[in-house]
């Protein structure tokens, strides 16, 4: 007999060889039905793995994040199974879980398009209803290679060859087998709420020199209600797509001459300036001085900073006069150079620097997505140089600033996470231990709840992440606060302590809105283009019922501009209904409509974008009304 301890501290006795599914059944049939896998002594295992010794057990159900991930990964296998049934000559490659779903890459021998997805989805449903048990076997590497080679799965053979392990797991459901680390669901019958969403091209291993594969995306949920809710959200997200709205509002465009880099138009720059000016004022409030540093630096600087060894594949390089240069992918190394121009005492610290720094990163062309994923962007970077004793206080101030900024921009629902050390990193474990604990202490001191993200920190230090929830429930990773003991040391940053000794300052990296391009894209989608008055590129459109009011329209327009209102004058010889409709489609918050009566009485008639009539008032009263709304960030 063995003893199994549960999360509530209770201990129960079972026969050796029992599995997690059996344990769940002994508690309740409904729990067994919901069980996807289990943590056995903190190791995630398949629900049917035998338990042969005393252990701690935590059952994973579809309600747990891990359970939903397992469900989606298993659905990717179901997709591959269906494809092999319908198109037997197809080679399967990889099928990972992604946000809200999964994808699988295939090498089809025939042409496949979006129109084929319903057929594949129908086959998936047929296979799921078979309630096929899902099992695995562990085989030597050579045997796995022979198994997949016999099936003509050359991509699987290549994957196995690239894995250092000598033992491979092969999962099987019905007549389909796939290479996978697992775990997977116990039975295909739990896959009931899924849908294939789109089809795209993808190079094998992300390398454009390799074969172009067909990538099929899908989504999978615990219940049909959850699936329906997600599909409704996708439909709403399509309406809010910043690329479409950006075109309608004439904000920006992209073209192949400069892939992944936006061309900003007048209206887009107006929004940009509001975001940048707001952040500049916020930085001033929190004691940051503003700097500006070079876009290009000698490659030796990036070698010293660690970027050359850890980030080279994302960097753009160039040569001049027999020297190697790199376009900066991050602003921090050049900021340190500003710090290093002076001798600093501990009394000078903390020193807070802010920069709206343009960076370039060589993102794969297939990953580019409007303003949300670009190759060139401007970061609202801040770098704070401080003593170890000042870290927690500085982080607390940064957290307060982040909360303040997000609320002003209309994001009131956000989560805080700490991304911990990744495998590919610089610095020793002792330094990482200290860094991670400092961030935890700062959040604890501020009574901020947070989630830990193992392995997701930057290569030079752990970071606090801010995830904002938008109007339709999507989560966006936005600002970061990163703690760095390594870079200031590598780049020779020092200060003189109270004993007259040289010390290396702690460097705090922070971005609040992050990429301005991405943040503006988020704002457009969050508000569906109906930006609040203080951010709107055009706040008021002035128009006359006929050309007889042109002079009065100009007079009102000038008065609005003198009061700092971003106004547009529409004197076109068009019907007033046409003008109202056009400016409504352009999401202008307020329309000023002037006719003979308004001209004679020197008043204005105001209509909101929503169609609500605000009646008549003087221009001065209207300006005061607008100013109050702008100051309140409404």
Curated annotation (Swiss-Prot):
Cofactor or coenzyme needed: Zn(2+)
Cofactor stoichiometry and binding remark: Binds 1 zinc ion per subunit.
Region annotation Catalytic: where it falls in the sequence: 241-532
Example of a GO cellular component annotation carried by this entry: cytoplasm
GO biological process per UniProt: threonyl-tRNA aminoacylation
Enzyme Commission number(s): 6.1.1.3
Swiss-Prot/TrEMBL keywords: Aminoacyl-tRNA synthetase, ATP-binding, Cytoplasm, Ligase, Metal-binding, Nucleotide-binding, Protein biosynthesis, RNA-binding, tRNA-binding, Zinc
CDD domains: TGS_ThrRS, ThrRS_anticodon, ThrRS_core
Record-linked InterPro entries: aa-tRNA-synt_IIb, aa-tRNA-synth_II, aa-tRNA-synth_II/BPL/LPL, Anticodon-bd, Anticodon-bd_dom_sf, Beta-grasp_dom_sf, TGS, TGS-like
Residues bound to Zn(2+): 332, 383, 509
Localization of this protein: Cytoplasm
One matching Pfam family: tRNA-synt_2b
Record-annotated TGS domain positions: 1-61
Principal EC category: ligase
Catalytic reaction equation(s): tRNA(Thr) + L-threonine + ATP = L-threonyl-tRNA(Thr) + AMP + diphosphate + H(+)
One MF annotation (Gene Ontology) recorded for this entry: threonine-tRNA ligase activity
NCBIfam families per record: thrS
Record family assignment: Belongs to the class-II aminoacyl-tRNA synthetase family.
Purpose of the protein: Catalyzes the attachment of threonine to tRNA(Thr) in a two-step reaction: L-threonine is first activated by ATP to form Thr-AMP and then transferred to the acceptor end of tRNA(Thr). Also edits incorrectly charged L-seryl-tRNA(Thr).
Subunit field text: Homodimer.
Protein name according to UniProt: Threonine--tRNA ligase
Phylogenetic placement of the source organism: Bacteria, Pseudomonadati, Pseudomonadota, Gammaproteobacteria, Thiotrichales
């Amino acid at each position: 007999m063995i003893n199994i301890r549960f999360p509530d501290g209770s201990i129960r006795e079972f026969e050796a060889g029992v599995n997690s599914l059996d344990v769940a059944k002994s508690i309740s049939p409904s729990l067994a039905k919901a069980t996807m896998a289990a943590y056995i002594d903190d190791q995630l295992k398949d629900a049917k793995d035998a338990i042969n010794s005393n252990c701690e057990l935590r059952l994973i159900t579809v309600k747990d994040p891990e359970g939903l991930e397992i469900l989606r990964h298993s659905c990717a296998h179901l997709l591959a199974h269906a494809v092999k049934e319908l198109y037997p000559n197809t080679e399967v490659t990889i099928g990972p879980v992604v946000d809200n779903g999964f994808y699988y890459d295939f090498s089809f021998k025939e042409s496949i398009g979006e129109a084929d997805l319903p057929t594949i989805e129908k086959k998936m449903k047929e296979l799921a209803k078979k309630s096929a048990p899902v099992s695995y076997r562990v085989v030597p590497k050579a045997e796995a290679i022979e198994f997949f080679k016999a099936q003509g799965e050359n991509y699987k053979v290549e994957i196995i060859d690239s894995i250092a392990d000598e033992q491979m797991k092969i999962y099987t459901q019905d007549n389909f087998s796939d290479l996978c680390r697992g775990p997977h669901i116990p039975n295909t019958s739990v896959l009931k709420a899924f849908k294939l969403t789109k089809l795209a091209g993808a190079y094998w291993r992300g390398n454009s020199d390799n074969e172009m594969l067909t990538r099929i995306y899908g989504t999978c949920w615990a219940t049909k209600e959850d699936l329906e809710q997600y599909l409704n959200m996708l439909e709403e997200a399509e309406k809010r797509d910043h690329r479409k709205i950006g075109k309608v509002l004439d904000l920006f465009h992209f073209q192949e001459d400069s892939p992944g880099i936006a061309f900003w138009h007048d209206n887009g720059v107006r929004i940009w300036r509001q975001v940048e000016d707001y952040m500049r004022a916020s930085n001033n409030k929190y004691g940051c001085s503003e700097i500006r540093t070079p876009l290009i630096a000698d490659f030796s600087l990036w070698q010293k900073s660690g970027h050359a060894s850890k980030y080279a594949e994302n960097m753009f390089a160039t040569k001049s006069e027999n020297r190697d240069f790199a376009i900066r992918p991050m602003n921090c190394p050049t900021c340190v150079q500003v710090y290093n121009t002076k001798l600093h005492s501990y009394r000078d610290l903390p020193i807070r620097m802010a920069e709206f720094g343009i960076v370039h990163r060589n993102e794969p062309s297939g990953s580019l997505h409007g303003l949300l994923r670009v190759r060139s962007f401007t970061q609202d970077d801040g770098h704070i140089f401080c003593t170890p004793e000042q870290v927690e206080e500085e982080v607390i101030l940064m957290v307060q600033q982040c909360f303040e900024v997000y609320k002003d921009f209309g994001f009131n629902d956000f989560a805080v996470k700490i991304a911990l050390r990744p495998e590919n990193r610089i610095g020793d474990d002792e330094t990482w231990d200290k860094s991670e604990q400092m961030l935890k202490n700062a959040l604890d001191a501020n009574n901020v709840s947070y989630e830990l993200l193992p392995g997701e920190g930057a290569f030079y230090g752990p970071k606090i992440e801010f995830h904002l929830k938008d109007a339709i429930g999507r989560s966006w990773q936005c600002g970061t606060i990163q703690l760095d003991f390594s870079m200031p040391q590598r780049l020779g940053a020092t200060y003189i302590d109270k004993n007259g000794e040289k010390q290396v300052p702690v460097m705090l990296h922070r971005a609040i809105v992050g990429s301005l391009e991405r943040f503006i894209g988020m704002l457009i989608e969050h508000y569906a283009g109906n930006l609040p008055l203080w951010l709107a590129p055009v706040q008021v459109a002035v128009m006359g019922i006929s050309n007889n009011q042109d002079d009065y329209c100009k007079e009102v327009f000038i008065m609005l501009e003198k009061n700092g209102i971003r106004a547009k004058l529409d004197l076109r010889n068009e019907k007033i209904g046409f003008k109202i409709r056009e400016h409504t489609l352009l999401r202008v918050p307020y329309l000023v409509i002037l006719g003979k009566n308004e001209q004679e009485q020197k008043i204005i008639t105001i209509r909101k974008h929503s169609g609500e009539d605000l009646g008549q008032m003087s221009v001065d009263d209207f300006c005061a009304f607008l100013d109050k709304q702008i100051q309140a960030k409404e």
